[in-house]
Amino acid sequence: MRHDGRQHDELRPITFDLDFISHPEGSVLITAGNTKVICNASVEDRVPPFLRGGGKGWITAEYSMLPRATNQRTIRESSKGKISGRTMEIQRLIGRALRAVVDLEKLGERTIWIDCDVIQADGGTRTASITGAFLAMAIAIGKLIKAGTIKTNPITDFLAAISVGIDKEQGILLDLNYEEDSSAEVDMNVIMTGSGRFVELQGTGEEATFSREDLNGLLGLAEKGIQELIDKQKEVLGDSLPELK
């Protein structure tokens, strides 16, 4: 039994609050245990210069964390005048993951900006951001289809992400909170589609190594968790994107 009472293969309680902010085309507050992230999707009728005239759209992301999202206050990166390497890595990860499940030609020459703002952090902020950002993007695209701005749904599959890790005493764990992540011998972030294909794997041994058997166990548990997340995504989206099942 884990410190928070969960089984080794159990997700933290997860909720999606849709239309959390009224201005963006898509907005979701994702809550995973004590981690809370606001994910907004904004549509812009232009693309970066390197894509102009090519008939393709673009999806890009920004990620930030409120100063007291963590136990100790952190200085805003805007006050420092530059973003950290960690922030840049996460932003690129979110954008890459979302583009993997979108036909950019069907999107047309427009950009979807994803803004993920962590308002409370207890581990798994990047995976929660990806899972929530997919929903925000899907809502925004659903509105474009309803308005007749685009004719066909460019989303090719569902998308979600989760963390898994190996604890010295408890073995393989699903959906690590901050305490578990800090002490894990191995931790991994896994991004997958609804059809069970991998988008990205990020795995690291922390002063430890892991075997192929361990890797298979981690991926199997991640696949289980991601399928549960995608089932919840489908439930909250309902029929707003009927072409996507």
UniProtKB/Swiss-Prot annotation:
One matching Pfam family: RNase_PH_C
Residues involved in phosphate binding: R86, G124, T125, R126
Organism field: Bacillus subtilis (strain 168)
Any single GO BP term: rRNA catabolic process
Enzyme class: transferase
This protein's record includes keyword Mitochondrion: no
Protein's recorded name: Ribonuclease PH
Enzyme Commission code: 2.7.7.56
Subunit and partners: Homohexameric ring arranged as a trimer of dimers. It has been suggested that the active form is the dimer which binds tRNA and that the hexameric form protects the substrate recognition loop (approximately residues 65-82) from proteolysis.
Effect of gene knockout: Correct processing of the 3' end of 23S rRNA no longer occurs in the absence of mrnC.
Purpose of the protein: Phosphorolytic 3'-5' exoribonuclease that plays an important role in tRNA 3'-end maturation. Removes nucleotide residues following the 3'-CCA terminus of tRNAs; can also add nucleotides to the ends of RNA molecules by using nucleoside diphosphates as substrates, but this may not be physiologically important. Probably plays a role in initiation of 16S rRNA degradation (leading to ribosome degradation) during starvation. Plays a role in the secondary pathway of 23S rRNA 3' end maturation.
Alphabetized HAMAP family for the sequence: RNase_PH (MF_00564)
GO MF annotation: an example: RNA binding
Gene3D superfamilies reported in the protein's UniProt record: GHMP Kinase, N-terminal domain
Alphabetical keyword list: Nucleotidyltransferase, RNA-binding, rRNA processing, Transferase, tRNA processing, tRNA-binding
Sequence intervals crossing the membrane: none
Miscellaneous note of the record: Sulfate ions in the crystal structure may represent the inorganic phosphate substrate.
PANTHER family cross-referenced by the UniProt entry: EXOSOME COMPLEX COMPONENT, EXOSOME COMPLEX COMPONENT RRP41
Catalytic reaction list: tRNA(n+1) + phosphate = tRNA(n) + a ribonucleoside 5'-diphosphate
Entry superkingdom: Bacteria
Family: Belongs to the RNase PH family.
